[in-house]
Amino acid sequence: ITWIFDAVNYYGAGNALSGFITVLLIAYVSIYFGIFLVAIKFFKDHKYRVLIIPSVFFLLEWFKSWVISGFPWLNLGILSESLWGLLPIVGISGTSFLIILIIALLLEKNRVIISRITASLILAVLLIGPGHYQDGGDEKLKITVIQPLTTNMERIINMTNEAESDLVIWPEAVTKFDKTVSKLVPKKVVIGGFFRQENTNVYTSAINLKTGHHYDKRNLVPFGEFQPFGSLLKSINNFFNIPNSSLSRGSFYQTKADWSALICWELVFNETFTRRVRGTKYIV
């Protein structure tokens, strides 16, 4: 999470305050693991501890993924690719549950043989399950990615028109969306990150310039893109002078198309990822 330190420091907080805020964030994430350790001690002698303890871990990980706006770092289910055998079926938190269940079964002092056998079977499924054999298809696309540091619109448009690609991807939040932009890149499939206004709401959106279809970013960055506690922490925003810190969250249900997009750190949100990939041909 060093990017938190860099971002806050960039907006003028200084090394000391940026470090303090980063430490607070680390402490916040650590609370969930602390609660889990307390739960282990509390339920260690319970008759159904083998199921209760993994369930507590599952609930804590799920809660951490959505409180405020969610901070799904250090999710156990995605730490090792070799254990993704059931990931498409049970998801990240479900995989985390199964990993903790395996550990609980291996540490079980009663019914040792059945516990070891059950743990071995679950581990085998995680190691060789269907998640390791997903077919990505044979279709190939030629893609051009415009570097995020490129912010000059004239240069971006020239690079886009010169590209001989099936798809051109622009940086996130490169500019405010204007329909005239789409006329500058005719007959090209371009997916770009724009600030899109609808009534009084402003979204950061991925927009297909050829079709006009868009996806609005749902998982916003706390303090950077929205105020998690509204006017209560408005003074913090004024102190840091953070731009675009009052964006609106995209709808949970968004219109499907043959392509879908995940913007910035939406990639680490299991529920958002799962919903976006269903029924789509491409994910950007």
What does each model-found stretch correspond to?
Residues 131-284:
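Soluble catalytic domains of enzymes that build or remodel membrane lipids, polysaccharides, and related
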Residues 1-132, 284:
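Membrane-embedded alpha-helical bundles of multi-pass enzymes
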